[in-house]
Regions:
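Juxtamembrane "stalk/linker" segments
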Residues: 1-40
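Extracytoplasmic/luminal low-complexity segments enriched in Pro/Gly and acidic/polar residues
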Residues: 123-159
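Charged, low-complexity, helix/coiled-coil-prone segments
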Residues: 1-10, 58-62, 135-149
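Non-transmembrane, low-complexity coil segments enriched in Pro/Ser/Thr that form solvent-exposed tails
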Residues: 28-120, 125-126, 150-157
């Protein structure tokens, strides 16, 4: 009987640990907690104000496809619902205006992310073609302090 109680207590503890781990992973994915880890810092200087929202959307997509786990742009935490609007010289992310120099902080496997950004005809190449100076720096510890404000889903519902 004592062994059964110990076993039940161990199972309850394992379930609680799994639930805490799942919650932490969900918070990181949603961008609602500060994080740190290996990754890259991408510095973009657009002195001519030639970059459009298209370049930012493309960069965000490349980062996600390369396995980025957390992304910040000019102090704004990006999430799955982030959006870019505006014209060259007047870009906004999630409704907040941003300006050059642009600093992307990205957590993930640094070499994979750096390679993805620097592929031929990729986002870094397109920004350079528009006159921007782009520097991609792999880093052993990127810190992202900003958090995204959670927004309720507009269309998705739980079944």
């Amino acid at each position: 009987e004592l062994d059964e109680l110990r076993s039940a207590a161990d199972e309850a503890q394992a379930r609680e640990q799994a639930a805490r781990k799942a919650e932490t992973q969900a918070q990181i994915a949603a961008g609602t907690v500060p994080v740190h880890g290996p990754g890259v810092t991408v510095s973009v200087v657009d002195a001519g104000a030639n970059l459009t929202s298209t370049q930012f959307v493309m960069t965000l997509g490349e980062l996600r496809n390369a396995g980025a786990e957390a992304i910040e742009l000019n102090g704004i935490r990006l999430s799955t619902r982030s959006s870019f609007t505006g014209q060259a010289g007047s870009i906004a992310v999630d409704g907040m205006p941003i300006a050059s120099p642009y600093t992307w902080k990205v957590i993930g496997e640094s070499q994979t992310i750096a390679t993805a950004l620097d592929i031929q005809a990729g986002s870094a190449a397109q920004m350079r073609a528009k006159g921007a100076n782009v520097a991609i720096t792999p880093t052993t510890d990127v810190t992202i302090e900003s958090i995204a404000s959670p927004r309720p889903p507009q269309f998705a519902t739980y079944q």
